[in-house]
């Protein structure tokens, strides 16, 4: 890592801290030549490839905004959406691929959204899966009903203690 002050090539790490739920590392460095300190940020790159072929960095806020529309009028908080976006990012990163299709991001949204709010799940799935008839909705509802009670291996949802 080059020193931003004297451009010397050698620096030593003085301190490291994990940020953003472990997806980034902040390092405090000291130049071996001039002794000045500077901060660097390290993150692993995760790129989303859209249908058009355009590649862009993964952005949690896009996940939140897409799901927020499906959750309008539902008892879903901003914290719930932030946790869902974090889970989606963790799922996508767990594939080990530096590039993922936008379609795969959408698939990663479906299960956590189903657990969060079934009505929002139906709204999102109807657009994402391109529902064309009532039969498509009935099929999705049947999936939801079949999945009820089968929460093995899924994180528990903490009940709300206070309502707003």
Swiss-Prot record:
Domain called ATP-cone: residue spans: 46-136
GO molecular function: ATP binding; DNA binding; zinc ion binding
Single GO BP term: negative regulation of DNA-templated transcription
Positions annotated as zinc finger (unnamed): 3-34
InterPro entries: ATP-cone_dom (IPR005144), NrdR-like_N (IPR055173), RNR_NrdR-like (IPR003796)
Needed cofactors: Zn(2+)
Presence of keyword Transcription: yes
The protein's role, per its UniProt record: Negatively regulates transcription of bacterial ribonucleotide reductase nrd genes and operons by binding to NrdR-boxes.
Protein name stated in the entry: Transcriptional repressor NrdR
